[in-house]
């Protein structure tokens, strides 16, 4: 999932997008990207953000879809990769709904017939992703074995952020058990 490193953003999207608001700190030619509370899709940085997050979600969907029927027979390492893909997909969609609200939502590789679908309400996306993250956390270690790897804390932290963003303090988060 090199996509997060390949994007031309040196700073995480959540911080950059805050800078592009009327009250933000960004003073370059893109300073009006978020003026008025909207993101201009004609701006190259916004297009790169949208495309990059969907590339991450699509790659994760390919891994998840290809492995979902074989999870029970997988090695612990393979199950961890499967869970990491689910967390990365959730993070990509979290970034998208944080910036755009309702967005097209896919949980499997997209066919040509599904390419142009409507937007899914962000509440439905959040509900799906919270359940998915709780399931994924079962396959993740508490401490990552390598720098940059996903662990349980990442999954549970993302669940908490989505719960707050979605307006619910009562999300089902296995970390509270």
What is the predicted function of each stretch?
Residues 97-98, 104, 144, 165-174:
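Short coil/turn linking the two alpha-helices of tandem helical-hairpin repeats
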Residues 107-109, 157, 170-177:
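Acidic, serine/threonine/proline-rich low-complexity intrinsically disordered regions
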Residues 148-158, 162:
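Amphipathic alpha-helical protein-interaction segments enriched in hydrophobic
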């Amino acid at each position: 999932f090199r996509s997060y490193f390949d994007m031309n953003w040196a700073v995480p999207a959540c911080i950059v997008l805050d800078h592009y608001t009327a009250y933000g700190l960004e003073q370059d030619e893109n300073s009006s990207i978020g003026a008025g509370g909207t993101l201009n899709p004609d701006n190259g940085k916004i297009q790169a953000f949208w495309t990059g997050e969907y590339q991450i979600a699509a790659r994760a969907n390919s891994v998840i879809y290809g492995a979902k029927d074989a999870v029970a027979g997988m090695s612990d390492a393979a199950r961890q990769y499967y869970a990491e893909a689910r967390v990365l997909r959730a993070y990509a969609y979290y970034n998208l709904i944080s910036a755009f609200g309702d967005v097209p939502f896919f949980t499997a590789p997209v066919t040509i017939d599904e390419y142009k679908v409507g937007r899914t309400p962000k509440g439905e996306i959040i509900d799906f992703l919270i359940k998915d993250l709780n399931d994924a956390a079962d396959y993740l270690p508490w401490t990552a074995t390598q720098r940059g790897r996903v662990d349980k804390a990442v999954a549970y932290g993302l669940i908490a952020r989505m719960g707050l963003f979605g307006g619910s303090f009562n999300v089902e988060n296995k970390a509270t058990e």
